Regions:
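Short, often N-terminal, low-complexity regions
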Residues: 16-28
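Ordered, amphipathic secondary-structure segments that act as subunit-interaction surfaces
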Residues: 103-147
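Helix-coil boundary and interhelical linker segments in multi-pass alpha-helical membrane proteins
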Residues: 33-36, 84-94, 144-160, 207-216
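Structural signature of hydrophobic alpha-helical transmembrane segments
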Residues: 35-46, 93-105, 157-168
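Small-residue-rich segments of transmembrane alpha-helices in multi-pass membrane proteins
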Residues: 71-77, 129-144, 165, 191-204
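C-terminal ends of transmembrane helices
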Residues: 51-60, 110-124, 174-184
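Loop-to-transmembrane alpha-helix initiation sites
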Residues: 95-100, 157, 188-194, 212-220
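Short, structured motif recognition centered on aromatic/hydrophobic residues
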Residues: 54, 69-73, 80-86, 163, ...
Length: 220
């Protein structure tokens, strides 16, 4: 009987193994869409540039209004100039106030006395903070500015896109320095303009050369 039962089992229909579909890419694309990714990237750039503008206002002993104005101008000024150039009106900063609110909130926090003491304690710390925040904001806004001009305004001309990226990445800093009566950073020995242009050209090359698989589509 055991042999018969075993034979019956062996002669029965085999259940074919069907591997479960891989849901990694689908799940990832649902959780982190391109729109969400760019939104988070723009928020990070907004915070970085708001810190940059507010800290410079604190260094010049401005009141809370001046610190807040410099933080907001640095954070959203480049984006406003970009939108005016490509014809997106009203500018996105006024359509979605989250960027203005984030920049204002960061500026107010940095104005607190204990935060100002930490920042002003060391010139080395101040210079390092400014370098990191400016570099982060410049890189983020150069790329997101070009992407916005492409997706929302339909810009395809490479020269215009590189200019828009430069304007988005450096425009806020230029307005910040003008408000404080300083010569803009990009007109001095700093390489902000050159770095923004180089980053914009590299971004265009990567978009042109990518093989359009999932990962490349997600980022480019």
């Amino acid at each position: 009987p055991k042999k018969q039962g075993r034979a019956a089992n062996l002669s029965g229909k085999r259940t074919e193994y069907t591997p479960a579909p891989q849901q990694g890419c689908t799940l990832f694309s649902e959780v982190m869409t391109m729109e969400t990714f760019l939104f988070l990237l723009e928020l990070a750039g907004t915070v970085a540039f708001a810190v940059s503008g507010a800290v410079l206002g604190i260094e010049k002993h401005m009141d809370i209004f001046g610190v807040g104005l410099r933080g907001i101008t640095t954070a959203v000024g480049g984006g406003i100039l970009r939108d005016l150039v490509v014809g997106l009106t009203p500018p996105r900063a006024f359509q979605d106030p989250i960027y203005l609110l984030v920049a204002l909130g960061v500026s107010v926090v940095l104005f607190f006395p204990f935060v100002r003491r930490i920042i002003g304690r060391s010139k080395r710390v101040f210079d390092a903070l400014m370098l990191i925040m400016d570099a982060a904001g410049l890189g983020i806004f150069t790329i997101t500015g070009m992407n916005t001009a492409t997706t929302l305004a339909g810009c395809t001309d490479p020269l215009l896109l590189v200019f828009v990226g430069l304007l988005t990445g450096t425009g806020g800093g230029v307005l910040r320095d003008i408000l404080a009566g300083d010569m803009p950073y990009i007109l001095r020995k700093h390489i902000y303009a050159s770095a923004s242009i180089a980053g914009g050209i590299l971004y265009l090359l990567l978009r042109h050369l990518c093989n359009r698989n999932f990962h490349m589509k997600f980022f480019f």
